């Protein structure tokens, strides 16, 4: 949960003037804990089962094929401004099934992120939070790296 909390706080606090690097985020742990426990957000998973370790991609892809319409409906109900996909199969599903391809923008050099133009929804590829990557790597080299690039892209588009 700590990785989720850091990421949630970073995504909501980062802007063109404040990049909220990992070292800054961890200084505010009590604030982050309160924020995480009181702010609305969703962690959408597919085929989540207790116990066990890893779910094979083949099984996950089959589950997405069988029940993807329910996941799409859940995301439509939530109408998020950001979707963080924990793993390749979920990201592939999101960018290929949620929105028409012609409405998605890829920022050059950032295949791990898409912008849905009509809703402004950002879709990110992320490591799964249970990945053995350190909290710092999970935070700085994943979603936050691409989000900062998106903010730069936004600034360029406004000029």
Identify what each model region corresponds to:
Residues 57-72, 92-159:
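C-terminal capping/extension of enzyme domains
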Residues 1-78, 82, 88-93, 131-132:
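A polyanion-binding, active-site-adjacent surface
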């Amino acid at each position: 949960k700590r990785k989720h909390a850091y990421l949630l706080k970073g995504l909501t606090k980062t802007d063109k003037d404040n990049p909220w690097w990992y070292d800054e985020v961890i200084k505010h742990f009590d604030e982050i804990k309160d924020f995480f426990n009181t702010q609305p957000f969703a962690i959408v998973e597919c085929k989540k089962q207790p116990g066990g370790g890893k779910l094979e991609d083949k099984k996950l892809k089959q589950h997405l094929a069988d029940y993807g319409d329910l996941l799409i409906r859940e995301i439509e109900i939530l109408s998020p401004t950001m979707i963080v996909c924990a793993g390749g199969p979920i990201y592939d599903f999101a960018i290929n099934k949620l929105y028409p391809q012609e409405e998605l923008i890829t920022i050059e050099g950032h295949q791990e992120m898409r912008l849905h133009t009509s809703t402004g929804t950002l879709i990110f590829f992320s490591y799964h939070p249970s990945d053995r990557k350190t909290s710092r790597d999970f935070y700085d080299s994943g979603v936050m790296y691409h989000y900062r690039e998106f903010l730069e892209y936004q600034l360029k588009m406004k000029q």
